[in-house]
């Protein structure tokens, strides 16, 4: 009522922009020991370890364990909180979960209230040469710092249309898609000696997702007038259309 200019009117608010990484209106905060109210009167309120917030929105939630305690306990804690309905309302904005002790870290996407946690999609971060990073300081610097944490949430997650569950890319998929997009941005199209490239890996490694994300990054960057996503099998095309 005090805002007579806008009271009763529709107001547009810009609360998140994946392109404004460490710049523009993006503001980053860390919330230590966030308190989660439970839906049950029997259960006590829960308290997490910490969250990364972008413009006040919780996007990455972390559970920590001391040295010698398996990160499986941190994963189980996250799964338990989700089963208790903790990540609802404002906390449903959490995109990525991280379970960490000083010697090991895994990260995974929030499957949402209707999804199921699948340990097969709990990933360890690795460097460009696919050497696993285990020390918490290395993981924090490479994955959880800005700009990488913002980029992971904004560019390297995929909403799977086939099951409605969010997917997050493995580290080698991130490096591949990023390098392909960078190569296109630096290409000199007037040069007649342009060469193509290919993504090679084993079955089940996520080549289709890497290809799709590469095409999406190139298209959104406006570095190419048109991007064609071509598949060599009808069933692969049908699957990709459903998923992406």
Region annotations inferred by a language model:
Residues 1-226, 231, 235-244:
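ATP-dependent helicase/translocase motor core
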């Amino acid at each position: 009522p005090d805002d007579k200019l806008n009271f009763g009117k529709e107001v547009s608010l810009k609360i998140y922009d994946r392109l404004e990484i460490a710049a523009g209106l993006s503001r980053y905060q860390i919330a230590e020991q966030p308190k989660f109210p439970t839906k049950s009167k029997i259960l006590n309120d829960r308290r997490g370890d910490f969250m990364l917030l972008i413009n006040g929105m919780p996007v990455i939630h972390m559970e920590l364990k001391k040295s010698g305690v398996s990160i499986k306990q941190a994963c189980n804690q996250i799964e338990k909180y989700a089963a208790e309905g903790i990540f609802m309302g404002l906390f449903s904005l959490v995109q990525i979960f991280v379970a960490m002790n000083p010697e090991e870290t895994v990260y995974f996407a929030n499957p949402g209230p209707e999804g199921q946690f699948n340990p097969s999609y709990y990933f360890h971060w690795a460097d460009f040469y696919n050497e696993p990073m285990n020390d918490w300081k290395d993981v924090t610097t490479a994955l959880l710092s800005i700009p990488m944490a913002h980029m992971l949430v904004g560019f390297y997650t995929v909403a799977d249309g086939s099951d409605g569950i969010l997917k997050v890319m493995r580290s080698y998929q991130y490096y591949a898609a990023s390098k392909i997009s960078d190569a296109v941005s630096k290409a000199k199209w007037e040069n007649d000696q342009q060469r193509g490239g290919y993504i090679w890996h084993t079955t089940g490694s996520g080549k289709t997702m890497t290809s799709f994300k590469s095409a999406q990054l190139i298209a959104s960057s406006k570095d190419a007038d048109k991007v064609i996503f071509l598949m060599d099998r009808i069933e692969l095309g049908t699957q990709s259309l459903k998923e992406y």
